[in-house]
C-alpha cells in the first residue's frame, strides 16, 4: 500500500538461493496464494519486467561480481568451522538465535589454510569491524548493533558455492532499484550487516 500510494512499483522476488531446498513449484504456489489474497505485483518471475532475473537461484554470476569486490578489499576469508563445533564451543548467540562467530578461522596462516583444505572445502566469511551501526526501522524504531560483538564475521558463501542471504538481498535490492523494504521483526537483526555491505559495495540502502 505504501509503494502504490507513492506511485511506486511492487517487485516479487523469489529468494530461492538453495534451489534444491526451494523447488520452483513452491514459488508457483506462493504466487497463487498472493493472487488469492488479492495482492498484485508489477514485476516478477511470471510477469517479467526490467529487473530480471527475479529468482535468486539464477543470479549467481551477479552475486559473484560483488563478492569479488569484497575479496579485493581483503575482507573475505575461508572458514572451516562446522555448526556443531561452534555450538560445542558455547559461543554467544545473536537475538535471532544464531551463533556469534568467535573468529576461529580469522587469523589462519596460508599454510594452515592449505592444510585444512585437504580435509574439507571452506565456507567464506566477511570480516567486520568493532563498530556500532544505528538505524531506524519504520515499524520498530531506532536500533543499534555492534557488528563484531552482536553479529560477528558472517557468511558470504557456503562451502558448496551457494551465496548467503545477506549478500544476495543487498545486491538484488540495489540492482532492482528497491527504495522501501517491509519485513518482519525476525529480520531486524540482519539490518546492521546489510547496511555494512551496502557501504562496502558503494550502494544506496533502501528505507526499512
Segments (PLM) and residue ranges:
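Active-site cores that bind ATP or allylic diphosphates and position pyrophosphate for catalysis
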Residues: 78, 83-207
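N-terminal Rossmann-like or analogous alpha/beta NTP/dinucleotide-binding catalytic cores
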Residues: 1-90, 94, 185-205
Amino acid at each position: 500500500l505504501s509503494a502504490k500510494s507513492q506511485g511506486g512499483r511492487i517487485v516479487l522476488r523469489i529468494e530461492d538461493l538453495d534451489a534444491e531446498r526451494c523447488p520452483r513449484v513452491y514459488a508457483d504456489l506462493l504466487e497463487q496464494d498472493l493472487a488469492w489474497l488479492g495482492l498484485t505485483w508489477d514485476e516478477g518471475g511470471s510477469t517479467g519486467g526490467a529487473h530480471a532475473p527475479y529468482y535468486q537461484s539464477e543470479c549467481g554470476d551477479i552475486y559473484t561480481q560483488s563478492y569479488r569486490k569484497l575479496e579485493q578489499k581483503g575482507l573475505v576469508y575461508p572458514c572451516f568451522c562446522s555448526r556443531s563445533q561452534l555450538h560445542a564451543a558455547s559461543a554467544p548467540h545473536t537475538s535471532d538465535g544464531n551463533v556469534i562467530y568467535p573468529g576461529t578461522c580469522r587469523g589462519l596462516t596460508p599454510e594452515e589454510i592449505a592444510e585444512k583444505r585437504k580435509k574439507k572445502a571452506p565456507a567464506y566469511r566477511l570480516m567486520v569491524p568493532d563498530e556500532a551501526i544505528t538505524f531506524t526501522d519504520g515499524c520498530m524504531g531506532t536500533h543499534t548493533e555492534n557488528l563484531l560483538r552482536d553479529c560477528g564475521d558472517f557468511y558470504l558463501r557456503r562451502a558448496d558455492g551457494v551465496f548467503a542471504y545477506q549478500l544476495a538481498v543487498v545486491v538484488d535490492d540495489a540492482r532492482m532499484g528497491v527504495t522501501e523494504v517491509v519485513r518482519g521483526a525476525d529480520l531486524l537483526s540482519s539490518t546492521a550487516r546489510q547496511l555494512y555491505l551496502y557501504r562496502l559495495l558503494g550502494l544506496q540502502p533502501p528505507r526499512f
